[in-house]
Amino acid sequence: MDSIVTEVTYGLEIKKIKDITELPFPVRQDSPLTEVLPTDLKTKDNFVARDPDLLRLTGSHPFNSEPPLTKLYDSGFLTPVSLHFVRNHGPVPYVPDENILDWEVSIEGMVETPYKIKLSDIMEQFDIYSTPVTMVCAGNRRKEQNMVKKGAGFNWGAAGTSTSLWTGCMLGDVIGKARPSKRARFVWMEGADNPANGAYRTCIRLSWCMDPERCIMIAYQQNGEWLHPDHGKPLRVVIPGVIGGRSVKWLKKLVVSDRPSENWYHYFDNRVLPTMVTPEMAKSDDRWWKDERYAIYDLNLQTIICKPENQQVIKISEDEYEIAGFGYNGGGVRIGRIEVSLDKGKSWKLADIDYPEDRYREAGYFRLFGGLVNVCDRMSCLCWCFWKLKVPLSELARSKDILIRGMDERMMVQPRTMYWNVTSMLNNWWYRVAIIREGESLRFEHPVVANKPGGWMDRVKAEGGDILDNNWGEVDDTVKQAERRPHIDEDLEMMCNREKMDVVIKYSEFEAHKDSETEPWFAVKGQVFDGSSYLEDHPGGAQSILMVSGEDATDDFIAIHSSFAKKLLPSMHLGRLEEVSSVTKVKSVEQNVKREVLLDPRKWHKITLAEKEVISSDSRIFKFDLEHSEQLSGLPTGKHLFLRLKDSSGKYVMRAYTPKSSNSLRGRLEILIKVYFPNREYPNGGIMTNLIENLQVGNQIEVKGPVGEFEYVKCGHCSFNNKPYQMKHFVMISGGSGITPTYQVLQAIFSDPEDRTSVQLFFGNKKVDDILLREELDHIQEKYPEQFKVDYSLSDLDHLPENWSGVRGRLTFDILDTYVRGKKMGEYMLLVCGPPGMNGVVENWCNARKLDKQYVVYF
């Protein structure tokens, strides 16, 4: 460090200073968290301690979170590590403390001298700096865009930003040592995590790495402590002024290149596509994603209101109230002004801005946490600022809202209008807080709440307002507005025949179809439909329609059907039900009574989670107590049941499952479920499986059934579509969690000493760890080797165990031919439950071999 002034303004290390509050610049040193939360103990992150105050945005795993907005603001310039927002694409890599200094990074690609270096050597060989940097997720404020039109990403509120003191070396120094080629333009960065679509890799421009104004770091400490696992322990990249998605965590590799990264995450994440590109267009054409012009690097200008808080109530008086919040910008450009409007943007008031980063700049050179603080060497602004404005409460009482906007030193100003895009990223239209007068008090509404309903956007949307109109969808006589339309029910728009909307169906006529097996009429949202034309084609079988004949099926229908399914209903629409609001509905969930059998195909009943057994990183056995200890489930072998829960918005979500437990088990119901956690392709993950995953012991879930067209009786006797069969053999084709219905039949066969039905099972999975119930299946095969055979198949050929003796690859015609060779049609039946690709192979094989459909059951 001879080239840098070493006579620092503050000659003592920060740990030796008794009272850091006396320093003229912000400093904090956080004590590491130690307690792992119960939710995380059940995931691959079972070693990561986290703050329970963080708002989880994607369920329990992977962990994505932001702090409560007020708590973030009240923490001040430097955010506690425990409250720093988190964006993880998968499980956190486990790095023991004793291995931190041996962590190794490779530098390769278009360089003269590629090399590898350990963290201990980085600390010894390179100049070390401590720098305050604000990090921001590109999806910050995404939920506001999703309220207008659902995009591809999960919901973020306005608190997806945090600031820390990062300690490490400059990325440019590490790259410079390898002597990059003059033709090189980019640096690829790769982490050690392994999310759903492979290792996370992205890139930045090489010239930025070499620019001291950019101050791009490789950091190993945050606020004076080793990196927390969620934030990249033991080593990460920190890129100020750029979206957080470029600051790769758990850094393992740096590759110098002449082109941008070609990694999946670089292509399909962190892009702002043109606003006219719909989710369907983006999904069907990769060219949108691979256009580097749409890649996000620098942050855009953003200002947020934190005070008043959402739903805060203030009594009107003669006092003043201080409106306050924060702002940030990208590319190192300072925010030059922040303005507040109390009259819908007609006039603006200039807020006072505080730039805490400048206090480091003014202090000169000094050392913190073993690193030189040299903010004074640069002009760039890499941190957020804080603003405030005092206004009379009487003026707030005359206002309908508070608006905020910023302008940077380039005179770029925040837009009034939202720029909607598929990823809902970089949303920075004016932040608006609505003011609701309630007598002599004022209540304030922020746009949204990150992980639950709430805010003025929810209210406006429910009232039928247009969030994007000239008054944000609010009713205001002083502002010219388009005629306010009643709220349009999107479900009915898809489901109804406009010509039948005025046809009235008498309730007596509707009720006459109760229990009808030929003309099943059912009601959804007050409209009547005739399901008879779809009995044979319904994917869930005719029984799914017949069980709601003559009843209001609103909750169940909306909970389980996609938009595609809803668009099939106009041809079945008969009209609206007479005085549906005045009809007394039978209560759908009855009080627990001492009933011998739990299930009822027409009524929901509640069961209670008693235990959750973690089988693997994404598979669990949920064990539910029935209504009393002697009660049977009442589920025939081969059929399934419905489970339903309410999501965070209060809407029912319903899915069909087949229990793992035998139907002879009393007082308990065990269901094996594979949890589909959120990922890039499906940012919300499996909605129902994540709701079930978040259940706590003692929570209740609703159950109804049985449903399904197949039932196994005993000794080869079964029924399918109400027709009896006598089978000698079953060929079972299962994939992943689709093993559960076939396992039900297996249990019935091999628990009966008189049952000699033979079974051949093909069980396909991606990796060895994905194979469910393997111990149970192997036990049956060992005990009945002549009667039962199972072929395990793995499709991920790049990660096959060396000693793998099972099938390699996916299901083929040859495999199916082998299974039925020597068997006569009519003596065997196929039982199939797998993903669409696997089911498609079976269907094509059946067509090619002219196998009658009556012998093929798709669960």
UniProtKB/Swiss-Prot annotation:
Positions of Mo-molybdopterin binding: 137
Residue ranges constituting the Cytochrome b5 heme-binding domain according to the UniProt record: 502-578
Chain sites annotated for binding heme: 538, 561
Cofactor(s) listed in the protein's UniProt record: FAD; heme; Mo-molybdopterin
Entry keyword set: Disulfide bond, FAD, Flavoprotein, Heme, Iron, Metal-binding, Molybdenum, NADP, Nitrate assimilation, Oxidoreductase
Sites where the protein binds FAD: 655-658, 672-677, 687-689, 737, 740
Binding annotation for NADP(+): 829-838
TM spans (from-to): none
UniProt superkingdom: Eukaryota
Cofactor note text: Binds 1 FAD.
BP-aspect Gene Ontology terms: nitrate assimilation; nitric oxide biosynthetic process; sulfur compound metabolic process
EC number assigned by the record: 1.7.1.3
MF (Gene Ontology): FAD binding; heme binding; molybdenum ion binding; molybdopterin cofactor binding; nitrate reductase (NADPH) activity; sulfite oxidase activity
Reactions accelerated catalytically: nitrite + NADP(+) + H2O = nitrate + NADPH + H(+)
Nuclease listed as a keyword: no
Domain FAD-binding FR-type: 602-713
Job description of the protein: Nitrate reductase is a key enzyme involved in the first step of nitrate assimilation in plants, fungi and bacteria.
Subunit structure, interactors included: Homodimer.
Family: Belongs to the nitrate reductase family.
PANTHER family noted in UniProt: SULFITE OXIDASE, MITOCHONDRIAL, SULFITE REDUCTASE
Protein name: Nitrate reductase [NADPH]
Source organism: Pichia angusta
